[in-house]
Each structure stands twice: as structure tokens, then as C-alpha cells.
Amino acid sequence: MKRTLVLAAAAAALFSTTATAGGVKGQYIEARTCDVWTGPCFANAEMNLGGKHAVLGWKVDKGTVGAARIDGLGIVAVIAASDTLGLKQTGPAKAVLLVDERADSAQRAALIAFAKSQAGSLLANVVAVQYAKVDLDVCGCDEGGCGKLTAGPARIETRCLSDKHDKICGNESEFYPPLSKGVKARAAMAVEHSYSGQGVDEKWNDAGRRGAYLGSFETR
């Protein structure tokens, strides 16, 4: 716990001054426990019943935060919120950060600062920082919706959405925007979305939901 607090404090200091200095770009993936590609009638029925948990993953292609280069490194945020994510929150969310195990201490602080700058208040209450191998592969399918994230106890795998097979009410759209700012992403089907670790209130396995985003990010 002491190590976690020290690293979080270092990241907070870095975040307050040079959170995205030099610019960072890379790949992004997200999955939630509710549909994000849906119609208003279905979204309204799920509000504050589901969608309180999410996994967000960033894999840096190239970038600098402060004096730390973080090329090729990744970080994942596991979030448990009080209300459906994307709606007004009545209490603070809890978050566990899974930091790339290859990063040195300066890079770890830089990755945490970067994630906090992207996810904002969702990462205001980080209850644990863990280290894991972070792999994010974005497949080259025509629609750009196929990706896979593996990071210790967190998993996401997506496929492209089909207007023919995945529509239910007929007026689906990206009802909830991505939880990370500065991303260019499209909604996708989460064929796997799970978290089996500790730190937040629940573990989950939420496959077969239109609740993912896959794309890229770039900050300046």
C-alpha cells in the first residue's frame, strides 16, 4: 500500500504540471457492462441498473509525459462507479490501475499521470496500482472494430458491429460516448469483457454486449 501511495503521489505531481507534455498517441479500447451502441428505449431501461463497471486500455505508440518516454507501453483502468457510467455520478468511483510491468519508476508515474488526464474524475479515487503485461492488438478488419486486450486479470475482445445482425430496436447509435477524452473510436461488440482481480467491489464476465469502443488517441 505504501508503494502504491508513493507512486500515486508522484503521478499526481507529474499530472499537475506536464501531464501530456510532448504529446502521446496510440491505441484505445474500452468495454462497459451496458450497451453503448443502442437506442434510447433500451438505454433508459438500463440506466442505473447496469453499466457501472468498465475496463479502459491505452497502448502508447509514441509519446512523452514530462521527461519520460513511454513508447510501446500500456496502462489499463478498471472502474467501478456508483451510477451508470456516462450519467451524473452520485458518489466517487473506485479504480484499479494495471500498469505495464516493463515500465521503470519514471515511466510508471508518467503512465498513471497520462491515464488520469484522459479519464478525469473516474480516476480520482485509485484504490490500487498493480503491474502486469499489457497487450493490446488492433486487428486490420475493414470496419475497424476488432481488437483484443490482455492485462493480468482484465480482458477485452471485440468484433465489428453488424447493422444486419446486431440491431434490436432499429434506431441504434453511439448513445454513450467513450469514457476517455481525445479518442477517435467506434462502437464494437464485446465478445469478451471480464475482470477477475481485486480492489473494486465486484468481478465480472460480461460477454456478448454492444458495449465496447475501439480506436486511437492523440494528445498534444
Regions found by a protein language model. Name each.
Residues L98-F217:
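Mature, soluble, non-transmembrane domains
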